[in-house]
Swiss-Prot record:
Organism in which the protein naturally occurs: Bacillus velezensis (strain DSM 23117 / BGSC 10A6 / LMG 26770 / FZB42)
Assigned GO CC terms: cytosol
Example of a GO biological process term: regulation of DNA-templated transcription
Family: Belongs to the TACO1 family. YeeN subfamily.
Name used for this protein in its record: Probable transcriptional regulatory protein RBAM_007230
Keywords tagged on the record: Cytoplasm, DNA-binding, Transcription, Transcription regulation
One term of GO molecular function: DNA binding
Keyword Transcription part of the UniProt annotation: yes
Localisation: Cytoplasm
UniProt KW Mitochondrion keyword: no
Domain of life: Bacteria
Length: 239
């Protein structure tokens, strides 16, 4: 758990700033979550998670509202949730989550991204067993001890609490995402620096510089694909 979540978020946001691609990806994810359940986050937990994540990336309100209104309006555009697994340079492990309205387009694009950048796509289950689904919540203005105390008082179980720069990062089971946030909100916390549901590698590996450069290019190419929502990996990039 050595990665710095605020650094990762800032790097991702800056890379996507010119194209607003990150907003488009959130728009798609919000639409799908709202369409699959109620368009009200209070009665749709999946939508609530996406909206909390969107807040930490400062996704504009109009994009959020447009996606929810599109779902309310009964739009017929349907998306499939897909997960691809594969290997990067030096046997590094990668999971790719996608939302697509054309499966026949997405799979070849992901496979090509792997193949052209020193990797190869694996079969389902080939790397996922080395990752744990995890809720990651970050707050400022609290110490790890203070966070632990308020979470214990709220009877919320977490895996770990780490201090990172000016933030405290809480790792918990995915189904504790809202419980962790509510515990902090009840303690006066109004904003979260990190709010993610992620696949966390059980063990991170370091790559030599040449393989690391190729790996970073592979991740960039995968993240730039229109249908790809999230890319998870087990490489320590020094973030």
């Amino acid at each position: 758990m050595g990665r710095k979540w605020n650094n990762i978020k800032e790097k991702k946001a800056s890379k996507d700033a010119n194209t607003s691609r990150i907003y488009a990806k959130f728009g798609r994810e919000i639409y799908v979550a709202a369409k699959q359940g109620e368009p009200d986050p209070e009665s749709n937990q999946a939508l609530k998670v996406v909206l909390e994540r969107a807040k930490t990336y400062s996704v504009p309100k109009n994009i959020i509202e447009r996606a929810i209104e599109k779902a309310k309006g009964g739009a017929e555009e349907n998306f499939d949730e897909l997960r691809y697994e594969g290997f990067g340079p030096n046997g590094s492990m990668i999971i790719v989550d996608a939302l697509t309205n054309n499966v026949n387009r997405t799979a070849p694009e992901v496979r090509a991204a792997f193949g052209k950048n020193g990797g190869n796509m694996g079969v389902s289950g080939s790397v996922a067993y080395m990752f744990d689904a995890t809720a990651v919540i970050g707050v400022e203005g609290k110490t790890a001890d203070e966070a632990l105390e308020l979470l214990m008082e709220a009877d919320v179980d977490v895996r770990d609490i780490l201090e990172e720069d000016d933030s405290v990062i809480v790792y918990a089971e995915p189904d504790q995402f809202h419980a962790v946030q509510e515990a902090f909100k009840n303690a006066g916390v109004e904003e979260f620096t990190v709010a993610e549901l992620t696949m966390l590698a059980q063990n991170e590996v370091e790559l030599p510089e040449d393989a690391k450069a190729q790996f970073e290019k592979l991740i960039d190419v995968l993240e730039d694909l229109e249908d790809v929502q999230q890319v998870y990996h087990n490489v320590d990039l020094g973030e």
